[in-house]
Amino acid sequence: MARVTVEDAVNQIGNRFDMILVAARRARQIAVQGKDPMVEEENDKPTVIALREIELGLVTADTLDADERQTVREREAAEIAAVAAIAEGRNDIL
């Protein structure tokens, strides 16, 4: 089991409260959304992995926001492509 001190993570983010929010978002990405960890897993839980990534400066609120915006853009592009394919199919029928 990994022993993690959060002091380095707090120093990277600025305060404990924001660090908790960033760590929770990143842990959720790893556990639920299937995002790949940026550090070795070493049989650690997603929360520990998230804290280690924050300590190393790999994850910040800004990087999470940018990743989220990119995911939304990709999802919207896929939806637009699907709608366009449907519309083209209907035009062929008419």
Swiss-Prot record:
Query: Which BP terms does GO give this entry?
Result: DNA-templated transcription
What Pfam families does its record include? RNA_pol_Rpb6 (PF01192)
Reaction equation(s) it catalyzes: RNA(n) + a ribonucleoside 5'-triphosphate = RNA(n+1) + diphosphate
The UniProt entry's GO CC annotations, sorted and at most eight, read: DNA-directed RNA polymerase complex
Name of the protein in its database record: DNA-directed RNA polymerase subunit omega
Q: Which organism is it from?
A: Shewanella violacea (strain JCM 10179 / CIP 106290 / LMG 19151 / DSS12)
* Alphabetized UniProt keyword annotations: DNA-directed RNA polymerase, Nucleotidyltransferase, Transcription, Transferase
Subunit-level organization: Consists of a sigma factor and the RNAP core enzyme which is composed of 2 alpha chains, 1 beta chain, 1 beta' chain and 1 subunit omega.
Keyword Nuclease among UniProt keywords: no
| Function summary | Promotes RNA polymerase assembly. Latches the N- and C-terminal regions of the beta' subunit thereby facilitating its interaction with the beta and alpha subunits.
Gene Ontology terms, MF aspect:
DNA binding; DNA-directed RNA polymerase activity
The EC designation for this entry is 2.7.7.6
Please name the top-level EC class of this enzyme.
transferase
Can the keyword Transferase be found in this entry's annotation? Answer: yes
- What family is reported? Belongs to the RNA polymerase subunit omega family.
